[in-house]
Amino acid sequence: FALLVDGLAAEREQGITIDVAYRFFATEKRKFIVADTPGHEQYTRNMVTGASTADLAVILVDARQGVLTQTRRHSYLVHLLGIRQIVLAVNKMDLVNYNQAVFDQIVADYGTFATKIGIKDFTPIPISGLAGDNIASKSDATNWYGGTTLIQHLETVEVDTNSAAEKPFRMPVQWVNRPNLDFRGFSGLISSGKISTGDNVRIVPSGRNTTIKSIVTQDGKLSEAVAGQSVTLTFNDEVDCSRGDVVALTESPPASGDRFEATLVWMSEEPLVPRRGYWLKIGTQIVSASIQPPKYQIGINTLEHLAAKTLDLNAIGVCTFSTDKPITFESYADSKTLGGFVLIDKMSNNTVAAGMINFSLRRAHNIHWQAADVDREAHASLKDQQPKVLWFTGLSGSGKSTIANEVEKRLHAMGKHTFLLDGDNVRH
């Protein structure tokens, strides 16, 4: 099976999955998109990418090895990503002589862990990818197994496809559609709910209210649109709306703010640098965000909350985020579109993490800015110079302190008042 879907030459040579391979097939009852994701730890980030849009997860376990750390990691991530339909496929049963005791022990071990992380139900199936046992047809070698085959289960399992349509209306604006002076519409993919002409809507975060004039698609105008459709909305009023804004019904708008707590899956070989600015992309919004040191890291095997100052590759932790301006968001449990985000390194433009918002954090209202009589201009006048801050940044050992010291010496020789703040001295 792996040789069928693994497309990269490196994957075929090593016998492992590195990238996410998408394959399509259909039976008489259903159409399927299979995302074959890597199981090796160093490619966990690829697994998160593939699982982020899945409705069902098939967790493969080698019958000879049982439940491993990576099995637990993937199961935790699957649950974290909101996938509630899980199949535990115990593979290579032919190599353990189709021993029921081996299968039962693996199911019991996995069930204990699944309960701890909140997985309420899963479907265990003994299979052999090489021999085809219990994949498309029942196997005589596992006559002790009374369940369905893998394909039969996939054909009949109930997938919640209507939940998005039943939630409050949300449409992140992707672009402003203005082909001529007589038309101005706002295009996007409806992430949840439904919308009709004449509905009262609010533009978030600005809070401007208006009504829907028309719903336009490539095939013509609609009177109603639902989650999953890409549409262009026109309004009866001239309101300020642009890419990154969210259109919602007036009676149920999403929250907006600049602080929240989120669970973070770190996907970069470079560790998290607390308080450094990262680009945060959520829906169609992109803002600058800083991250406080992790509240804790989650130990995959024990699920303990471990003390952590940073997050390394494949680590999972809980952090507090601050953005440079208010954004529109919801908890990941309520909206994958407005609750899931990625972090992008500002220097390399690499995606370094995926996050899921837990809840909003409110700033304390009893803390106010204290005005000072001696302001910046007064200090500058006293020193008879224009104040400036010079920040020297670079890799460790690159000579930042040496250059900063030389700059201060030259400024001092020019009669300028200076103060040198060195990071090593602060931490000493």
Residue spans for each PLM region:
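Conserved nucleotide-binding/hydrolysis micro-motifs of P-loop NTPases
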Residues: H40-E41, R64-V67, I83, K92-N97, ...
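Glycine-rich phosphate-binding loop of ATP-dependent small-molecule kinases
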Residues: N350-T351, G355-H428
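Canonical P-loop GTPase G-domain recognition
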Residues: R84, V96-E166
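P-loop NTPase switch module centered on the Walker A-proximal segment
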Residues: F1-R45, A54-A57
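Residue-level signature of catalytic and energy-coupling elements of molecular machines
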Residues: G15, D36, M47, V58, ...
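Active-site phosphate-binding and catalytic loops of NTP-dependent enzymes
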Residues: L3-I18, F113-F122, E155-F169, K221-S223, ...
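C-terminal effector/interaction modules appended to NTPase cores
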Residues: T27-R30, N180-Q386
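Conserved Switch II/interswitch segment of TRAFAC-class P-loop GTPases
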Residues: R30-F32, T37-Y43, S52-S75, H79-D104
